[in-house]
């Protein structure tokens, strides 16, 4: 039974309706809910990344370049958008470090791309025939592209796909530019 791994990138309140929210991010929520309902079946694994910053955010390199505090651990803005998290009922926020916890998958990250996420997906490969890794979320041109590239680097023989209808960029132009960059790197872009 071939399994798909679905990675929902940073669909947190601060990126949708909060500090860094955009109309485009809000617009993809219903489409994503529908798509996740379809994909939440069989042996498929749905994973969520959570951008996670702390009180020292403004002192970090990211904070100096983007001086907008967001996704501070424990704040409402850090939580995953309710419509999205309610599709897959894993209970409370959960960060896992072992295969037995795999179905309760929350990967916390304080960087755009998560090496931990790529390592976890790679670690599944020996025992699980992964047919495809599908990414969706925000921002197309920052965290989606960063994670797609990392997964492709860690798992070169796995089909990495990005569902454009479930992604939003910092701007619509940057969204499209990121999709083109990913296509150049043999990441499949669907539903444009």
Question: Which residues are covered by each model-predicted region?
Answer:
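Short Gly/Thr/Asp-enriched flexible loops that form oxyanion-binding sites at enzyme active sites
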Residues: 144-153
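Glycine-rich anion-binding loop/nest that anchors nucleotide
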Residues: 131-143, 162-167
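Short, well-ordered secondary-structure micro-motifs
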Residues: 59-60, 117-119, 146-147, 173-174
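Short, small-residue-enriched loops and turns at beta-alpha junctions
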Residues: 114, 167-171
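Alpha-helical scaffold elements lining the catalytic groove of polysaccharide deacetylases
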Residues: 108-127
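Active-site acidic carboxylates
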Residues: 1-106, 127-131, 157-161, 170-191
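Generic structural signal for well-ordered alpha-helical scaffold segments
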Residues: 36-37, 121-126, 152
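Active-site-proximal beta-strand/loop segments in catalytic clefts of secreted hydrolases
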Residues: 49-52, 110, 138, 165-166
């Amino acid at each position: 039974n071939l399994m798909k791994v679905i990675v929902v990138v940073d669909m947190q309140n601060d990126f949708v309706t909060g500090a860094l929210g955009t109309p485009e991010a809000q617009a993809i929520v219903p489409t994503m809910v529908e798509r996740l309902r379809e994909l939440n079946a069989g042996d498929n694994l749905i994973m969520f990344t959570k951008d996670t910053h702390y009180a020292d955010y403004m002192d970090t390199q990211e904070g100096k370049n983007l001086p907008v505090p967001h996704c501070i651990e424990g704040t409402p803005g850090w939580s995953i958008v309710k419509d999205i998290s309610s599709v897959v009922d894993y209970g409370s926020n959960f960060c896992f470090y072992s295969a037995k916890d795999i179905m309760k998958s929350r990967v916390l990250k304080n960087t755009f791309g998560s090496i931990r996420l790529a390592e976890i997906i790679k670690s599944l490969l020996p025992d699980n025939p992964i047919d495809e890794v599908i990414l969706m979320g925000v921002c197309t041109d920052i965290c989606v592209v960063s994670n797609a590239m990392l997964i492709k680097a860690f798992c070169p023989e796995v089909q990495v796909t990005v569902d454009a209808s479930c992604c939003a960029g910092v701007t619509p132009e940057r969204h499209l530019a990121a999709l083109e960059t990913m296509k150049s790197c043999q990441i499949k872009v669907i539903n444009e």
